[in-house]
Amino acid sequence: MLEGQIIKALSGFYYVFSEGKIYQCRARGNFRKRNISPLVGDDVEFQVENKTDGYILDVLSRENALVRPPVANIDIAILVFSAVEPDFSTNLADRFLVAIEKEDIQPVICISKMDLATDAEKEQIAVYKEVYETIGYDVFVTNDEPDKEAIKDYISGKTAVIAGQSGVGKSTLLNSLNSDLTLKTAEISNSLGRGKHTTRHVELMPIGDGFVADTPGFSSIEWDDLQPETLQFCFPEMEDRRSGCKFRGCMHDNEPNCAVKTAVEANEIADFRYKHYIQILQELKNRKPRY
């Protein structure tokens, strides 16, 4: 019996990487009865039938798992946003960050297409970059060679997911990190301002000593399992100040003597970050319950 990691799931087969080899495996027949559904990224125990095929016997415990994309055991999330085409959006960036923070996955922000931006756009993005770095996020510009090497170092020995709108340059970034990938890239559709989807399934691809999951592009994020009272924990600069609020259950909205609102007024917390927090908070409060 061997242990390995699922790097691709396609047409009922699971492709398991173990000791430098890839095995095409099927899941045991009793998995469905046991309500076990293997995911890309899962660590598994499997039995080899021949040099290339085998059966998955068990799925080992998961550190975490995303629903969309369906990937397990993620160490870091590389969030790619373009400077232009489509334009950089702090609203979208913060929503992606919340989606990743709530899963306790370390996010890394990458900004692509900076070479296509005007001087004014570059100046504005530099301001946003400083805000996110002050919070504690690492921000890289994918056009810069030193930053590409830093991204490779981040991925080394880890499983990462790369996410962002379609058309922002995720596949281009992966191709630049590993020239053997030759992933398809897409231009932006002029009518919708969105990229054509070029990634059809989730697959872990080797980048140095690590793996990265390229995932279908998406521009909307759902908060099905996020509660209003836990949203503040997805904003690190707010979580750091919550102990200074007068009320223990302060949600930093209409409550008096709120340390977070005081920090916003003192420009210690970026106004746009607080604005997005309130927007998402209201969405969560107004969400219709699902039965």
Swiss-Prot record:
It comes from Listeria innocua serovar 6a (strain ATCC BAA-680 / CLIP 11262). Monomer. Associates with 30S ribosomal subunit, binds 16S rRNA. One of its GO terms (cellular component) is cytoplasm. Keywords: Cytoplasm, GTP-binding, Hydrolase, Metal-binding, Nucleotide-binding, Ribosome biogenesis, RNA-binding, rRNA-binding, Zinc. This is Small ribosomal subunit biogenesis GTPase RsgA 2. It comes from the Bacteria. The keyword Transmembrane does not apply. The keyword GTP-binding applies. Gene3D superfamilies: Nucleic acid-binding proteins, P-loop containing nucleotide triphosphate hydrolases, Probable gtpase engc, domain 3. NCBIfam families: ribosome small subunit-dependent GTPase A. Its cofactor is Zn(2+). Zn(2+) binds at C245, C250, H252, C258. One of several proteins that assist in the late maturation steps of the functional core of the 30S ribosomal subunit. Helps release RbfA from mature subunits. May play a role in the assembly of ribosomal proteins into the subunit. Circularly permuted GTPase that catalyzes slow GTP hydrolysis, GTPase activity is stimulated by the 30S ribosomal subunit. It is an enzyme of class 3 (hydrolase). PANTHER family: SMALL RIBOSOMAL SUBUNIT BIOGENESIS GTPASE RSGA (PTHR32120), SMALL RIBOSOMAL SUBUNIT BIOGENESIS GTPASE RSGA 1, MITOCHONDRIAL-RELATED (PTHR32120:SF11). GTP binds at S112, K113, M114, D115, G164, Q165, S166, G167, V168, G169, K170, S171, T172. Belongs to the TRAFAC class YlqF/YawG GTPase family. RsgA subfamily. It is found in: Cytoplasm. Its EC number is 3.6.1.-. InterPro entries: G_CP_dom, NA-bd_OB-fold, P-loop_NTPase, Ribosome_biogen_GTPase_RsgA, RsgA_GTPase_dom, RsgA_N. Binds 1 zinc ion per subunit. PROSITE patterns: ENGC_GTPASE, G_CP.
